[in-house]
Amino acid sequence: MTEQRLLTPDEFEAALRAKGAFYHIHHPYHIAMHNGEATREQIQGWVANRFYYQTSIPIKDAAIMANCPHPEVRRQWVQRILDHDGYDGSEGGIEAWLRLGEAVGLSRESLLSEERVLPGVRFAVDAYVNFARRACWEEAACSSLTELFAPQIHQARLDSWPQHYTWIEAEGYDYFRSRLNQARRDVEHGLSLALEYCNTMERQQRMLEILQFKLDILWSMLDAMTMAYTLDRAPYHTVTREAVWHKRRLV
């Protein structure tokens, strides 16, 4: 058994980046979407369920800011909320995602109602938001380090989806384009916080576990979608074909 020790900053960054092997880009559901093998229902299901994640991100970021006592950090972190909620002449990522929904044939009303959000997806996303509320702000902030791997997945969608899914309207891809630069900027900030905060072996190991927790969330979301849209085993499928599960935020 290898003895654990305090990693150098370069070694710790390498350990964080190595977690990319478990990023949800490698999930069979994502692989199918990338390869043009997903059905219209599977694409729509992903867009509708992922919208719950998108609308929860600024709530998560607000929780981090509420727990952070440092104005200089809050001034930089608030940009993440603005990126999603929009400001002045910028529509924001949530609005861009609504247009993605329309581009794949979903109505804004359907997305905003959360009627399509699967319980497994809701539970996973809510676990992320609740972690951000309860953890110390440094740990909650660094849980966003899955952004280390995000530019790759956004670019992959831009490269493959227009070729495979000609029925998706072109303006729907604006969200992915906007996140290419935003994610890279957020990575620089989040990584610098992690390298500064994780100055003990215990903190480094805990942060690696937190990053794995976030990866588990993203993977579990796709597991829920696989059950519903690939295996045709939506919740309560042995009892009813109706979507009887709860469809609103309860907390």
Swiss-Prot record:
SUPFAM superfamilies the record matches: Heme oxygenase-like
InterPro entries per UniProt: Haem_Oase-like_multi-hlx, PqqC, PqqC-like, Thiaminase-2/PQQC
GO biological-process terms attached to the record: pyrroloquinoline quinone biosynthetic process; sulfur compound metabolic process
GO molecular function: pyrroloquinoline-quinone synthase activity
Catalytic activity: 6-(2-amino-2-carboxyethyl)-7,8-dioxo-1,2,3,4,7,8-hexahydroquinoline-2,4-dicarboxylate + 3 O2 = pyrroloquinoline quinone + 2 H2O2 + 2 H2O + H(+)
Pathway(s) where this gene product acts: Cofactor biosynthesis; pyrroloquinoline quinone biosynthesis
Pfam families: TENA_THI-4
The protein's Enzyme Commission number: 1.3.3.11
Entry's transmembrane regions: none
Organism domain of life: Bacteria
Keyword annotations of the record: Oxidoreductase, PQQ biosynthesis
EC class (word): oxidoreductase
Described purpose of this protein according to its UniProt entry: Ring cyclization and eight-electron oxidation of 3a-(2-amino-2-carboxyethyl)-4,5-dioxo-4,5,6,7,8,9-hexahydroquinoline-7,9-dicarboxylic-acid to PQQ.
HAMAP family associated with the record: PQQ_syn_PqqC
Family the UniProt entry places it in: Belongs to the PqqC family.
Protein name: Pyrroloquinoline-quinone synthase
Classification of source organism: Bacteria, Pseudomonadati, Pseudomonadota, Gammaproteobacteria, Enterobacterales
Gene name for this UniProt entry: pqqC
